[in-house]
Amino acid sequence: MEIRVIDTKENKLLGRKEIYFEVIHEGEPTPSRADVKGKLVAMLDLNPEATVVQYIRSYFGSHVSEGYAKAYESKERMLYIEPEYVLRREGIIQEQEE
């Protein structure tokens, strides 16, 4: 699996970097969000606790997927801005049992 960063934007108002990327996964299934997040964090020297992979889109018959990630300045900023379902999906907050 290889990740290529297409574009990086600095969003000062929300205190985050917005990263558009491509994942080349020839002969492999679409990689998980956790795998992509781990590689992006290592590649761009980001804080893993304040980074969220918003989406990874694959197209039928293609070995290239495109994605979008957000890297916040701090975990507190991310918790304030990101919707609860995204935080649950990323495993940052746990579901409460009723």
Swiss-Prot record:
<dbReference type="GO" id="GO:0003735">
    <property type="term" value="F:structural constituent of ribosome"/>
</dbReference>
<dbReference type="GO" id="GO:0005840">
    <property type="term" value="C:ribosome"/>
</dbReference>
<dbReference type="InterPro" id="IPR012677">
    <property type="entry name" value="Nucleotide-bd_a/b_plait_sf"/>
</dbReference>
<dbReference type="InterPro" id="IPR001976">
    <property type="entry name" value="Ribosomal_eS24"/>
</dbReference>
<comment type="similarity">
    <text>Belongs to the eukaryotic ribosomal protein eS24 family.</text>
</comment>
<keyword id="KW-0689">Ribosomal protein</keyword>
<dbReference type="Pfam" id="PF01282">
    <property type="entry name" value="Ribosomal_S24e"/>
</dbReference>
<keyword id="KW-0687">Ribonucleoprotein</keyword>
<dbReference type="GO" id="GO:0006412">
    <property type="term" value="P:translation"/>
</dbReference>
<protein>
    <recommendedName>
        <fullName>Small ribosomal subunit protein eS24</fullName>
    </recommendedName>
</protein>
<dbReference type="GO" id="GO:1990904">
    <property type="term" value="C:ribonucleoprotein complex"/>
</dbReference>
<dbReference type="InterPro" id="IPR018098">
    <property type="entry name" value="Ribosomal_eS24_CS"/>
</dbReference>
<dbReference type="InterPro" id="IPR012678">
    <property type="entry name" value="Ribosomal_uL23/eL15/eS24_sf"/>
</dbReference>
